[in-house]
């Protein structure tokens, strides 16, 4: 039986599940240790990533089912980028177990469609093709894209790269599966029906999730809350950890 890597830290009474993004692992959350006095943090390496080896390419529903199987019975869920889709899917599949949902630099539909801003599908397909040719360079390029434009871009990209290199790396099959989820998932309609506290955090400079998404979802999901970190890109918790932690604490405390 292939098992997921989970780690629980923190002294708080509320449970908070943290889900990382594509290509990364749970070590990416080390910069927000300030949450530990307030929450019991449940850190997981998604199936096939980091220390959760032995999985192949999975659909969004399959990945979410595997995570839910070992997640705490009741918790807040926070997901970054691809992890935001998994956290959202968990809330759709088992809403009774999700106290509230926080998505970070995430979109219910990452690919650009008709009137919807996002990553061009051919760019995502290109990444899939490049992975098979030059694994290391493609992952590095994707990490660099995540921090582009911020004052601390180089330093932040180095931090992300260290997270990848310090743990077992995902296979090309797993990474392609993740890109396929980003290319095809569209949770806009089902999430509009979700009746849970929902906070969406964005980076103003994010090149992967355009800030226009925040505005469109403000209109489509009026019961949700959005916050934009002015000088952040795709990893606001790395470039602006204090501001990020304050947002999380305030939102959960209010609910």
From Swiss-Prot:
EC number: 3.1.1.85
Localization terms from the record: Cytoplasm
Transmembrane feature ranges: none
Catalytic activity entry: 6-carboxyhexanoyl-[ACP] methyl ester + H2O = 6-carboxyhexanoyl-[ACP] + methanol + H(+)
Pathway assignment: Cofactor biosynthesis; biotin biosynthesis
Gene3D superfamilies per the UniProt record, alphabetical: alpha/beta hydrolase
Pfam families found in the cross-reference section: Abhydrolase_1
Ranges for domain AB hydrolase-1: 16-241
Domain of life: Bacteria
Keywords: Biotin biosynthesis, Cytoplasm, Hydrolase, Serine esterase
Subunit structure: Monomer.
Family, similarity comment: Belongs to the AB hydrolase superfamily. Carboxylesterase BioH family.
HAMAP family registered for this protein in UniProt: Carboxylester
Function: The physiological role of BioH is to remove the methyl group introduced by BioC when the pimeloyl moiety is complete. It allows to synthesize pimeloyl-ACP via the fatty acid synthetic pathway through the hydrolysis of the ester bonds of pimeloyl-ACP esters. Also displays a weak thioesterase activity. Can form a complex with CoA, and may be involved in the condensation of CoA and pimelic acid into pimeloyl-CoA, a precursor in biotin biosynthesis.
Protein's name according to its UniProt entry: Pimeloyl-[acyl-carrier protein] methyl ester esterase
Organism listed in the record: Serratia marcescens
Lineage: Bacteria, Pseudomonadati, Pseudomonadota, Gammaproteobacteria, Enterobacterales
Gene name linked to the record: bioH
């Amino acid at each position: 039986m292939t098992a997921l890597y989970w780690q629980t830290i923190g002294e708080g009474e509320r449970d908070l599940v943290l889900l990382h993004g594509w290509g990364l692992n749970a070590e990416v959350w080390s910069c927000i240790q300030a949450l530990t006095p307030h929450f019991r943090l449940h850190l997981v390496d998604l199936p096939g990533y980091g220390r959760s080896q032995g999985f192949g390419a999975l659909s969004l529903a399959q990945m979410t089912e595997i995570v839910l199987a070992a997640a705490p019975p009741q918790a807040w869920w926070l997901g970054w980028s691809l992890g935001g889709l998994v956290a959202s899917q968990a809330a759709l599949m088992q809403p009774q177990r999700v106290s509230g949902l926080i998505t970070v630099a995430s979109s219910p539909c990452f690919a650009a469609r008709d009137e919807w801003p996002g990553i061009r599908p051919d760019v995502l397909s290109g990444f899939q093709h490049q992975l098979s040719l030059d694994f290391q360079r493609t992952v590095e390029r994707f990490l660099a894209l995540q921090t582009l434009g911020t004052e601390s871009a180089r330093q932040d990209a180095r931090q992300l790269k260290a997270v990848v290199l310090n743990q077992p790396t995902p296979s090309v099959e797993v990474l392609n599966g993740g890109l396929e989820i980003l290319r095809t998932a569209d949770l806009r309609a089902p999430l509009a029906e979700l009746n849970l506290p929902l906070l969406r955090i964005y980076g103003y400079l994010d090149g992967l999730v355009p800030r226009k998404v925040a505005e469109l979802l403000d209109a489509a999901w009026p019961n949700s809350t959005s916050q934009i970190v002015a000088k952040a890109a795709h990893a606001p918790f790395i470039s602006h950890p204090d501001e990020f932690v304050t947002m999380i604490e305030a939102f959960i405390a209010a609910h």
